[in-house]
A protein has these predicted regions:
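Conserved ABC transporter NBD signature motif
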Residues: 65-80
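Helical segment within the ABC ATPase nucleotide-binding domain
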Residues: 170-182
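Helix-to-loop junction immediately C-terminal to a conserved catalytic motif
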Residues: 58
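A short, proline-enriched helix->beta-strand linker immediately N-terminal to the Walker B motif
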Residues: 150-154
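The feature captures the beta-strand-to-loop junction immediately N-terminal to the Walker
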Residues: 43-45
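Conserved ABC ATPase signature
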Residues: 131-135, 139
């Protein structure tokens, strides 16, 4: 069975990035280095440009100027998987067929063994033939996570993927994501300071002046909700966010 991520994944290098949409300049001369093989969370005020930055990194929105590449100097094109807030499962397909969607879109034969392995990893083996409408929100996000991993891409971009879930389900899916995404380069956008501190190796805060790093986090993710270090990190992060919001 193929592993989730065989080779050392690249980091993400953003250099002198500028983006203007219409008459609004979202960011200018932005520089950013995201460590390969680690989980990095990006937070900030609403409208700071977090989702726009992620879309530029993903190649969905062209930048006005600047350069984005892997830390190995190669383009990130073809090496990125995406997971958003909406699961975007096709209702007429089974869960297994949704997981294999990338193969279908490429006109390739589905790797059912790989899909079944991933469904087992996310606890959905018994739901492989079910339709999305029969699953809970948490189960659908598990399926979306398996679909993200199916492509075997080393870089995973996540735009608030857990925000629509109830607290307990969100905690469970956070833990699962931290476990199955080990060895990937992950960039997570979130407004939840606790989620960011629980899941991440590195924290970044985006404001009108650019992006700044937060103090290092203690321990390894996923951290327990009552971990003393997590609580201290969350307090420091909230203070930092309050500062950029002024």
């Amino acid at each position: 069975m193929s592993q989730l991520c065989n080779a050392t994944p690249p980091g993400i290098s953003v250099r002198q990035l500028c983006l203007t949409l219409g008459q609004q300049q979202l960011f200018s001369q932005l520089n950013l280095e995201i460590t390969g093989g680690k989980f990095t969370a990006l937070l900030g005020t609403s409208g700071a440009g977090k989702s726009s930055l992620m879309r530029v990194i993903a190649g969905l929105t062209p930048p006005s100027s600047g350069q984005i590449s892997g830390s190995d100097g190669l383009p990130l094109t073809g090496r990125i998987a995406w997971m958003g807030q909406q699961d975007l499962l096709y209702p007429w397909l089974t869960i297994e067929q949704n997981v294999c969607l990338a193969s279908r879109l490429k006109g390739e034969k589905a790797d059912r063994d790989w899909a079944q392995y991933l469904l087992a990893r996310v606890g959905l083996s018994q739901s492989a033939r079910a339709r999305p409408a029969t699953l809970s929100g948490g189960m659908r996000q598990r399926a979306a996570l398996a679909r993200t991993l199916y492509t075997r891409q080393p870089v995973v971009l996540m735009d608030e993927p857990f925000s629509a879930l109830d607290a307990l389900t969100r905690h469970q899916i956070q833990t699962l994501a931290a476990e199955v995404l080990v060895g990937h380069t992950v960039l997570l956008i979130t407004h939840d300071a606790a989620e960011a501190c629980r899941l991440s190796h590195h924290l970044l805060v985006m404001g009108t002046a650019g992006i700044e790093a937060s103090p290092p986090l203690l321990g390894l993710p996923p951290r327990a909700a009552d971990d003393a270090g997590l609580i201290r990190s969350q307090a420091a992060l909230l203070k930092q966010l309050s500062g950029i919001a002024r």
